Swiss-Prot record:
Protein name: Geranylgeranylglyceryl phosphate synthase
Species the sequence originates in: Thermoplasma acidophilum (strain ATCC 25905 / DSM 1728 / JCM 9062 / NBRC 15155 / AMRC-C165)
UniProt entry tagged with the keyword Transferase: yes
Pfam families given in the database record: PcrB
Reactions the enzyme catalyzes: sn-glycerol 1-phosphate + (2E,6E,10E)-geranylgeranyl diphosphate = sn-3-O-(geranylgeranyl)glycerol 1-phosphate + diphosphate
């Protein structure tokens, strides 16, 4: 059976990927499930559960169980701390906030979670996490040395270091609810030299923004706030998903 990472890599080779981020600290389990169900209808490829809110494993269990009862999509944990783990998920982004000024977020939470995770039969996906200006909550909580949104050299330096460390993915984050996203020029420059997939999230609210990032080379686009705040998640997400899938089709052709 194909692993979650293998499925991701296959999808990025053949086009572009959209992921929907759901924060179980912001919504009750059944509402998380409704968002996931409508996101699947809109064409999203994976569901991420987590975010900047620090919640416990019980809340993660409840949210993920509710989501998996409503959708066939793979569920990936996007942890904000060592407490945000669950055996109910299909995979977890085992991630390091490389530009944090605190070792707790570079490796500390990861060490605390390692033994509990070893007992869980979920896939662990090594991912480098880089927080850009303005950073929002995750930048503040994670004590990030924010990368300017248009700083190509710093972004490339971190991304290459991540690749050389052996991370399988790199995630460029502007922060949940950010007024703007990481610059297209940064994504374009990094993709010229990087061999591993680039995920971009934060501040992506429109089909035009998502399409521009996909055209710049982003392999995966993450949206979260727009889904959480929309009464009709399908109507909010479908145009965004379609915009990046169109770029993916042109990539194949």
């Amino acid at each position: 059976m194909m692993t979650v990472l293998e499925d991701m890599l296959r999808k990025t080779r053949n086009g572009k990927v959209h992921m929907t981020l759901i924060d179980p600290g912001a919504k009750p389990p059944q509402e998380c499930a409704r968002i996931a169900e409508e996101a699947e209808m809109a064409g999203t490829d994976f569901i991420m559960v987590g975010g900047s809110t620090d919640i416990d494993s019980r809340a993660m269990d409840e949210a993920i169980s509710a989501i998996k009862a409503k959708t066939d999509l793979k569920v990936i944990i996007f942890p904000g701390s060592s407490l945000m783990i669950s055996p109910k998920a299909d995979a977890i982004f085992f991630m390091s906030l490389l530009n944090s000024g605190s070792l707790e977020y570079v490796v500390g939470h990861q060490v605390k979670a390692a033994i509990p995770l070893s007992a869980m039969k979920i896939e662990k996906i090594p991912m480098a996490y880089l927080v850009f200006d303005p950073g929002m909550t995750v930048g503040r909580v994670g004590k990030a040395h924010l990368i300017p949104r248009d700083d190509e050299k710093t972004a490339l330096s971190y991304a290459l270091a991540a690749q050389y460390f052996g991370f399988r993915l790199v995630y460029f984050e502007a922060g949940s609810g950010s007024p703007y996203h990481v610059g297209e020029n940064v994504v374009r420059r990094v993709k010229q030299e990087l061999d591993i997939p680039v995920i971009v999230g934060g501040g992506i609210r429109t089909p035009e923004a998502a399409k521009a990032l996909a055209q710049a080379g982003a392999d995966m686009i993450v949206t979260g706030t727009i889904a959480e705040r929309s009464v009709n998640v399908y109507e909010a997400l479908h145009p965004i998903v379609e915009s990046i899938k169109e770029v993916g089709i042109s990539k194949i052709q």
